[in-house]
Structure formats: structure tokens, C-alpha cells
Amino acid sequence: MSQRIIQPSASDQQFPGKSDGYEYTVGPKQAITSEASTTYIPSRIYSESLLFKRQEASLSAMAFLFQEMISQLHRTCKTAGDFETKLSDYGHNIGIRLLELLNFRASVSPSSLPRASAFLSQNESSSKLSNASNSPGMLANSSTATSASANERLQEKQTESLSNYITKMRRRDLKILDILQFIHGTLWSYLFNHVSDDLVKSSERDNEYMIVDNFPTLTQFIPGENVSCEYFVCGIIKGFLFNAGFPCGVTAHRMPQGGHSQRTVYLIQFDRQVLDREGLRFG
């Protein structure tokens, strides 16, 4: 017959149900008060991303991360086609998110930027004050007073967002040329800190366009003429266009010219439905 183990100085009321161990997401129960558990701390992630700030990752860190992605795919993929497809899928997941971010960011008027910056700084100070008030090392009376005042300010900002400073959303791009110019300028500047070197329409097929980059940033440390590693950027372009309502296929081609040995052309082939839709809408 099994025997129940009774812990010293512990009653049944303290342990009403079965426990799997220490709850790391909550922490020690005696350190959490009912007031602290109900405190709402508004997230600044979305507001910060809407406000344009030059936040750059170091090239060495990005190159190291990209190298690890390539190494992992080389170990798991059996064919070059499988490698390019999976690498493109990685970029696709980024591209579908960049459309909304850049559209919202382009909709914040320049006159609202000073007020938006002030909003973020006030929101940050309120969050820090709330975190300090919930720390277990403070005295009980001062913690209660500080937490109450912090909660009042947080409740006021609970419904606020940087999106309130957007008075008019940027119009959605409906033409192929408009969305490609947005990629050529805004998207490329966001990703690589410069616009792409050229945007060309094919003279042979009406559904083919080309974006040219004379000096690809991510693959500049990868020697050789193999363009398989460029399919990460192909995936970003494809995901961006797919989320914008322009389904297509994107491939990469190495075409050296002049002194640019790594000059890469990203060939975009739109589905026939995109051309038919544009012909019906705009003639």
C-alpha cells in the first residue's frame, strides 16, 4: 500500500492539488502579491517598430547567423532544389510581415514624429517604474504607494498606441510597377540601407521583371558563382508580393558586369492572374 508523504510544516490547504514542481513562469509564490499579478504592462514592441529609427545589426553578426542557416540546410537537404526551396521559405516568412510594417511606418506623418518619440519615452519610464515597484527588495509601504501611482499611469496608457498618430493610411499598391518600385526603394533601403541598383522590365515576356543588386549584402563573403544562397532574398521578395496580392515566382541569377563580379539579378515572374486583373482594372 502506498503511503502519502507529508512535508513538514505544510498543510493540505497549502497544497490543494498535484504539482509538477517549481513553477518557473511564476516564481516563488510568497514573492507575488495579488496587486502585482494584476498589473498591466503595455508592450512597446509594436509602437517601437512603427517609429522609424536606424537600428542596424552588425554585418559580422548577420553574416554569422546567415552562415549557420546555410550550414544547417546543407546538412539536412539532399538536393540543390530542396536547399533553395527551404532557404526561400525562411525569407518568405519575413517578407509577408514586412508589408504591413513598412506600410504602417510610411503612414506616420513627419509632423507626428516628435510627439511619437515623446510617447515612447513616457511609456518606457512608466514601465520601468512599474517593474521597480514590483521588486521584492523594497519596503512594503513605499512599494504600495509607488505601485498604485504606476498602475494609474499604466491604466491611462493601456489603450494608447503609436497607431493613434496615423491620420491617413498609405494607399495599397494595385499596379505591378507601383509595388515593384516600393520594393526597389523602400524595402531594399530597410533591408540593406540602399536602394536596389536597377528595376527592369523584360522585353520578351510581359510577366517578367528584374531587380538588380550589384553588391549583395548577405552573400558578399560567399565565394564562387553559385547563387543558391541568394534564394533567401528571393523568398523575402516573394513573401512581400504574395501578401500584397501579387503571387509570383522569384529566382536568382548571377550576371557579372563591369567591376561587379557578384552582380545578382532577381527575376520575378508574376502569375497570369495578376496580369489579367491589372488589364481588367486599368485597361
Curated annotation (Swiss-Prot):
InterPro entries the record matches: NO_sig/Golgi_transp_ligand-bd (IPR024096), TRAPP-I_su5 (IPR016696), TRAPP_component (IPR007194)
Major place of residence: Golgi
Compositional bias ranges of the Low complexity kind: 126-151
Keyword hit for Lipid metabolism: no
Localization per record: Golgi apparatus, cis-Golgi network; Endoplasmic reticulum; Preautophagosomal structure
Keyword list, A-Z: Autophagy, Endoplasmic reticulum, ER-Golgi transport, Golgi apparatus, Transport
GO biological process, one term: macroautophagy
Region (Disordered): 1-20, 126-156
Recorded GO CC terms: cytosol; endoplasmic reticulum; phagophore assembly site; TRAPPI protein complex; TRAPPII protein complex; TRAPPIII protein complex
Ranges of biased composition (kind: Polar residues): 1-16
UniProt keyword Lyase present: no
Function: Component of the TRAPP I, TRAPP II and TRAPP III complexes which act as guanine nucleotide exchange factors (GEF) for YPT1. TRAPP I plays a key role in the late stages of endoplasmic reticulum to Golgi traffic. TRAPP II plays a role in intra-Golgi transport. TRAPP III plays a role in autophagosome formation.
Family note: Belongs to the TRAPP small subunits family. BET3 subfamily.
Subunit structure: Part of the multisubunit TRAPP (transport protein particle) I complex composed of BET3, BET5, TRS20, TRS23, TRS31 and TRS33. Part of the multisubunit TRAPP (transport protein particle) II complex composed of BET3, BET5, TRS20, TRS23, TRS31, TRS33, TRS65, TRS85, TRS120 and TRS130. Part of the multisubunit TRAPP (transport protein particle) III complex composed of BET3, BET5, TRS20, TRS23, TRS31, TRS33 and TRS85.
Name of the protein this chain belongs to: Trafficking protein particle complex subunit 31
Lineage: Eukaryota, Fungi, Dikarya, Ascomycota, Saccharomycotina
Gene: TRS31
